[in-house]
Amino acid sequence: MKIIFQSCFQEYMRKCGTTLVQTHQLVLDNAWINDMFAGEYNPCHFHASKNSLVGLSSVLFLKTPDTYGEEIINPKTPSNGHLEFIGGAQHSLSISQFRTSPKVGDFFVFPYTLVHGVYPFSGTDQVRRTLSYNCDILPKVMIKAK
């Protein structure tokens, strides 16, 4: 599993066109599973590491409920059970918020510093299960010194 995540993080960096690929190394930091039930949510937050100011996070959706329940707040812009990313430039030609209704198998990789959160859902006793991994991006010279 570790090799799969590391490969995804490396591909993300390549697609971003960053030169960090040559000068830095990916170090997988920690992994965890989240089980969330109706009414539970994950407030907006970002990730950090004691080892690096630069890193990547990921979330893989392993299980999702059959329904996220009736949309009460604003049916035109649903949010029940959605994953939301917040960031980017704040002007009219930029998307500063991205919200998605995740399905089993959806996999997202994003920078540590990207603010994100998960909305609560209702109408079911089924679980939403995710697997997340954090990855530090450390200078190769720092790793050799250890």
Segments (PLM) and residue ranges:
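Catalytic core of non-heme Fe(II) oxygenases with the double-stranded beta-helix
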Residues: 34-109, 113, 119, 125-127, ...
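Signature of the catalytic double-stranded beta-helix
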Residues: 1-54
